[in-house]
């Protein structure tokens, strides 16, 4: 089998590449996916409110676990990644958050990455998006990703939480992806007008899968990339439970889009990585690249949970006797409780003047429950998810064997610096100040978690060690750049070899301020033009907010 391009991983970036490359009818593409189809009849991946379900099994989730995390009481922590057409866009929380303009401007300060500035990238965010209230300078109107905005008649807790953030002295913003990210405001979501999850399988592959020049193979677990000398020439994979590899050859390039955990793992198994690690597993060295699998970053977050005095939370929706009606309303009308991810309000703030752009993110949820659907509080409640955005902690992903079915050793090294601890203490204390504002007076009951007895630095630190969880945003393990730990150049080409690119969240040099999915899709769009040899889209002329000397906050109301 010969193809022009072989794409490994039909996820948030891989599906973008498969769709854009096959727009050229004389270009043939093979798309390999280790998981299965995105079964449209399975409400678990299609109903936005069911977002906790795909995380609970292994049909759609790789369900990786970390090594014992040394600063987190040696807990083995969850590291869920999407498996199946759509990748992590099939199982994520559907928050459409792009990050801060300064994140990209920060990447672009590195020599060779100047074309990754915010204004260079904004046209690609717009190209990917169709926003339900129409396009403007920041948003698209005819892209493959459906974005839904919160409506005025949604849960009153969303409005109260935004007001409370403003009353606490922080800015208000009407669009967290627009002119100004900093502040509290409504949060967009990747949901279609019919109330379905807008994964990249739905948005991109649906328009491409009928093309004769695109071949999609599911249940195809990539073993390794084939090389002729230093030139990537093809891919070997295992289908289903088979132990006999299948292979295909690439006339032009192999495009690795397996994500921040699997992409470095595949490179290492293929002979590209740190020579000493590969030698330990008798893997023939193709190219010594010490940065492969290093620079691992993530967002850590925790929940502050409160009793709700008014019966307006989502608690009734968790009762089995209410669920048939909710399901029917969603299935037949695409409306109701089932049609939202319920992260419809949030915010970004600076916890101190030391930060030039926000370092803390909030998601608000009008129910008290764990992200994966466990430990629901048996009463009306609400919660704030809060966490730091650009932790200095760095981890790694290392293979444990040559077996593609064995998970790698993953260590995030969470909370390994003093900055991490200070940010989380500040975040908890600021959250309590926000919750104490007048806007929440009629709703706010007792603090369920961590509880008002948790006050000192030592008590807060112990709570974080015991209860903080991943926000499921791993990145950075094949970083872009030109220093000795960089893995790819500014076009995603792997240093030291030919005809091989990495295009996914692993190439982010530094994690962004917010959820990763929208930016991973943008990376796919931008790289697709580079691979096709097309002129980049014209740089945007939109203005954007830079805090400069603006104070972190105004005096709070209370």
From Swiss-Prot:
Catalytic activity: choline + A = betaine aldehyde + AH2; betaine aldehyde + NAD(+) + H2O = glycine betaine + NADH + 2 H(+)
SUPFAM superfamilies: FAD-linked reductases, C-terminal domain, FAD/NAD(P)-binding domain
Signal peptide segment: none
InterPro entries on file: BetA, FAD/NAD-bd_sf, GMC_OxRdtase, GMC_OxRdtase_N, GMC_OxRtase_C
Superkingdom: Bacteria
Pathway note: Amine and polyamine biosynthesis; betaine biosynthesis via choline pathway; betaine aldehyde from choline (cytochrome c reductase route): step 1/1
A Gene Ontology BP annotation from the UniProt entry: glycine betaine biosynthetic process from choline
GO molecular function: betaine-aldehyde dehydrogenase (NAD+) activity; choline dehydrogenase activity; flavin adenine dinucleotide binding
UniProt key word Transmembrane helix: no
Main EC class the enzyme belongs to: oxidoreductase
Keyword Iron-sulfur part of the UniProt annotation: no
Binding residues for FAD: 4-33
GO cellular component entries: membrane
PROSITE patterns named among the record's database cross-references: GMC_OXRED_1, GMC_OXRED_2
Cofactor requirement: FAD
EC number: 1.1.99.1, 1.2.1.8
Residue positions of the active site: 473
Keywords attached to this entry: FAD, Flavoprotein, NAD, Oxidoreductase
Function: Involved in the biosynthesis of the osmoprotectant glycine betaine. Catalyzes the oxidation of choline to betaine aldehyde and betaine aldehyde to glycine betaine at the same rate.
Family indicated by similarity: Belongs to the GMC oxidoreductase family.
NCBIfam families: betA, PRK02106.1
Protein name from the UniProt record: Oxygen-dependent choline dehydrogenase
Organism, as annotated: Citrobacter koseri (strain ATCC BAA-895 / CDC 4225-83 / SGSC4696)
């Amino acid at each position: 089998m010969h193809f022009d391009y072989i794409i490994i991983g039909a996820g948030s970036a891989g599906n973008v590449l498969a769709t854009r490359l096959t727009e050229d009818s004389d270009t043939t593409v093979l798309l390999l996916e280790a998981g299965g189809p995105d079964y449209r009849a399975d409400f678990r991946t299609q109903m936005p409110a069911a977002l906790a379900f795909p995380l609970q099994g292994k049909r759609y989730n790789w369900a990786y676990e970390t090594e014992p995390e040394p600063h987190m009481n040696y807990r083995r922590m969850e590291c869920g990644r999407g498996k199946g057409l759509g990748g992590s866009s099939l199982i994520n929380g559907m928050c459409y958050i792009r990050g801060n303009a300064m994140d990209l401007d920060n990447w672009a300060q590195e020599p060779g990455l100047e074309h990754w500035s915010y204004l260079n990238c904004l046209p690609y965010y717009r190209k990917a998006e169709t926003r339900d209230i129409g396009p403007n300078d920041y948003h698209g109107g005819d892209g493959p990703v459906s974005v839904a905005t919160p409506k005025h008649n949604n849960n009153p807790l969303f409005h109260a939480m935004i007001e409370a953030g403003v009353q606490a002295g922080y800015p208000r913003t009407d669009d967290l992806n627009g002119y100004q990210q900093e502040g509290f405001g409504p949060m967009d979501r990747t949901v279609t007008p019919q109330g379905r999850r807008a994964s990249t399988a739905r948005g991109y592959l649906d328009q491409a899968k009928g093309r004769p020049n695109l071949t999609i193979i599911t249940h195809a677990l990539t073993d390794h990339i084939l090389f002729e000398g230093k030139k990537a020439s093809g891919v070997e994979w295992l289908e289903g439970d088979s132990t006999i590899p299948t292979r295909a050859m690439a006339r032009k390039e192999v495009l690795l889009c397996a994500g921040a955990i699997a992409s470095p793992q595949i490179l290492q198994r293929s002979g590209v990585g740190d020579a000493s690690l590969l030698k330990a597993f008798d893997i023939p060295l193709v190219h010594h690249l010490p940065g492969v699998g290093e620079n691992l970053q993530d967002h850590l977050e925790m929940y502050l949970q409160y009793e709700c005095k008014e019966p307006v939370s989502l608690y009734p929706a968790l009762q089995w006797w209410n669920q048939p009606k909710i399901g029917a309303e969603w299935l037949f009308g695409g409306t109701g409780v089932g049609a939202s991810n319920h992260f419809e309000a949030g915010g970004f703030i600076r916890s101190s003047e030391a930060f030039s752009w926000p370092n803390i993110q909030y998601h608000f949820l009008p129910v008290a429950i764990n992200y994966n659907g466990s430990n629901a509080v048996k009463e009306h409640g609400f919660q704030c998810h809060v966490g730091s955005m650009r932790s200095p902690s760095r981890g790694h992903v290392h293979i444990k064997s040559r077996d593609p079915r064995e998970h790698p050793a993953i260590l995030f090294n969470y909370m390994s610096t003093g900055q991490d601890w200070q940010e989380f203490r500040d975040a908890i204390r600021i959250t309590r100040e926000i919750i104490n504002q007048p806007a929440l007076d009629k709703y706010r009951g007792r603090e369920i978690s961590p509880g008002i007895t948790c006050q000192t630095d030592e008590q807060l630190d112990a709570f974080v060690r015991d209860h903080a969880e991943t926000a499921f945003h791993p990145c950075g393990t094949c970083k872009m750049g030109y220093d000795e730990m960089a893995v790819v150049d500014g076009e995603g080409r792997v240093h030291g070899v030919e005809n091989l690119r990495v295009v996914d969240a692993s190439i982010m040099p530094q994690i962004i301020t917010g959820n990763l999915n929208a930016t991973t899709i943008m990376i796919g769009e931008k790289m697709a033009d580079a691979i096709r040899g097309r002129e980049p889209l014209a740089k945007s002329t939109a203005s954007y907010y830079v805090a400069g000397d603006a104070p972190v906050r105004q005096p709070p109301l209370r």
